[in-house]
């Protein structure tokens, strides 16, 4: 919480705040990882936008000069396990099928994976759709996979929103989790497709950013 300018932790000179963000990049874990991700998605809405651009440029310079830093940042895509488990479970639905946490299984890996690849290629865009378009334009991401990721992300977000609203109506704690057995046949197929794209994207990131050799 308190990610706002009235919090001293989120304001400072270009040099001072730049040093703070540099520290987040050098130790991307826990709160540092979360803060760095928030910063990389930030965009100016008032004041001197160039100040934000200067700090972000310095971070990108540091990151792209050290592959290990980008890899450590990207490792968070595996924080909640693999999409393969959810995907395989959907292939053989039974009476004991677990709920699917859409954020952990697909939304976060797509958003953070694209964020990480954008950092590696110094893509200045801050939205996932814009980053995918820029990465495809640069040849850093195949257009078909980029399209699948974007479509999958939109589908997962819609499904999670609908599930959350249904929980609200029933007076339950909102989780946004989905019971695959309550989905239509088409929705299950689309969910399988989305998680399949996530699985392939994570494999690509592991290979491209050498995540398996990061200590």
Can you describe what each PLM-predicted range is?
Residues 1-215:
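A nucleotide- and high-energy phosphate-metabolite-utilizing enzyme signature
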């Amino acid at each position: 919480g308190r990610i706002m300018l009235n919090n001293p932790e989120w304001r400072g000179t270009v040099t001072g705040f730049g040093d703070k963000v540099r520290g987040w990049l050098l130790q991307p874990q826990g709160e540092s990882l979360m803060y760095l991700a928030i910063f990389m998605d930030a965009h100016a809405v008032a004041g001197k936008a160039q100040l934000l651009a200067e700090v972000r440029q310095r971070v990108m310079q540091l990151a792209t000069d050290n592959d290990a830093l980008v890899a450590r940042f990207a490792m968070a895509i595996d924080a909640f396990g693999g999409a393969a488990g959810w995907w395989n479970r959907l292939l053989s639905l039974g009476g004991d099928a677990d709920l699917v946490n859409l954020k952990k299984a697909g939304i976060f890996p797509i958003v953070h994976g694209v964020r990480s690849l954008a950092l590696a290629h110094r893509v200045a865009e801050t939205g996932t759709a814009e980053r995918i378009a820029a990465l495809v334009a640069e040849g850093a991401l195949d257009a078909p996979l980029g399209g699948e990721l974007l479509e999958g992300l939109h589908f997962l977000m819609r499904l999670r929103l609908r599930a959350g609203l249904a929980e609200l109506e029933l007076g339950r704690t909102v989780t946004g989790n989905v019971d695959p057995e309550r989905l239509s046949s088409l929705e299950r197929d689309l969910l399988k497709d989305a998680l399949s794209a996530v699985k392939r994207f994570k494999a690509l990131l592991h290979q491209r950013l050498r995540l398996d050799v990061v200590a």
